[in-house]
């Protein structure tokens, strides 16, 4: 079955979405649409199957953010100005449990990183940051994310440099990966 990733729409069915995490389920059901349409503080992209184009089976939310230069490793910010650096925040990423283990998380993350590259070419941003759950740290590390200081509560702040993302995308396009 083909999966489509697109922006969240008002009439999408989110009530049956269950990733096994209450706050991630609640965000999609109660906040994603308002944050996107009314508050303009995040944009949510959803995965749907072509056969059920309104039923959300996965999602991610991206927003703009900034990070103090000294929060990143020295080698990552060498030569940059001393003020806060623009970032893309991967604020949420979740897959419905019924669709876990099928590569949907990978597809969602790949789309989020493509969006980050496009944004960086329009307005400039240095990295993608995520505050990962402890259970997701290794998963993000497999994609090149690096742990740094920070995070909220029990989450772990991680970053991935836009230049690294671009290099990986170019390698894939040229058939090197």
Regions found by a protein language model. Name each.
Residues 1-38:
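Short amphipathic alpha-helix that is part of the acyltransferase structural core
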Residues 43-50:
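Cytosolic beta-strand hydrophobic patch enriched in CBS
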Residues 53, 59-92, 100:
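Conserved acyl-donor/pantetheine-binding loop and adjacent beta-alpha core of acyl/acetyltransferases
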Residues 57-58, 149:
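A structural microfeature
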Residues 101-115:
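Conserved acetyl-CoA-binding loop-helix of GNAT-fold acetyltransferases
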Residues 123-135, 149-177:
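C-terminal "cap" of GNAT-fold acetyltransferases
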Residues 130, 140, 145:
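Conserved active-site tyrosine of GNAT-family acetyltransferases
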């Amino acid at each position: 079955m083909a999966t489509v990733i697109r922006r969240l729409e008002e009439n999408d069915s989110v009530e049956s979405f269950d990733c096994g995490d209450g706050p991630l389920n609640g965000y999609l059901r109660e906040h994603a649409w308002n944050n996107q349409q009314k508050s303009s503080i995040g944009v949510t992209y959803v995965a749907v199957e072509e056969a059920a184009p309104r039923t959300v089976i996965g999602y991610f939310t991206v927003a703009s953010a900034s990070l103090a230069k000294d929060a990143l490793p020295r080698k990552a910010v060498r030569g940059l100005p001393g003020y806060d650096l623009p970032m893309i925040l991967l604020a949420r990423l979740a897959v419905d449990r019924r669709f876990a283990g099928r590569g949907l998380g990978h597809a969602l993350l790949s789309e989020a990183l493509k969006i980050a590259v496009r944004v960086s070419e329009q307005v400039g941003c240095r990295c993608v940051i995520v505050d990962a759950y402890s259970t997701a740290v290794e998963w993000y590390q497999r994609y090149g994310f690096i742990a740094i200081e920070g995070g909220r509560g029990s989450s772990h702040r991680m970053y991935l440099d836009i230049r690294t993302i671009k290099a990986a995308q170019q390698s894939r396009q040229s058939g090197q990966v």
